[in-house]
Amino acid sequence: MVDTYPTTRVRRSPFYEATVADGLTAATTYNHMVLPMSYGDPEAEYRRLTEGVSMWDVGCQRQVEVRGPDAARLAQILCPRHLTHCAVGQGKYVPVCNHRGTVINDPVVLRVDEECFWFSIADSDMGLWASCVAAERGLDVQVTEPEIGRAHV
């Protein structure tokens, strides 16, 4: 049995109740969300991964959406990899760096449309960083976190 308490600091994915029903015994926090870690029998989990099928709740792999007339400009400012040839529907693995060039995240960026990019982030507050950079540059963009729940097989 897993006891978690509702809070705005740690969210649950749309699959949380199903993972608990399937026997979740341990969890951690990742991207301010519950990340299932164990179902109580590591050997059985290993066999499911190597000999069968395992379904994982990875709703904690969040997106940061950058949308607006300056979305492409902000996306390019955030990462040193050239995105000028990133077509709609195309994704690229990119480092995201701070002002000193230190890598602060390594997401996959997807160009959703001409004025929208999604950064599929690792465990960090990249949305805050992107919002700050957009504000300091006076860019016409909105930085949000779209509600996307994902599960992997």
Regions found by a protein language model. Give the residues of each.
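Acidic, proline/glycine-enriched N-terminal capping motif
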Residues: 1-97, 102
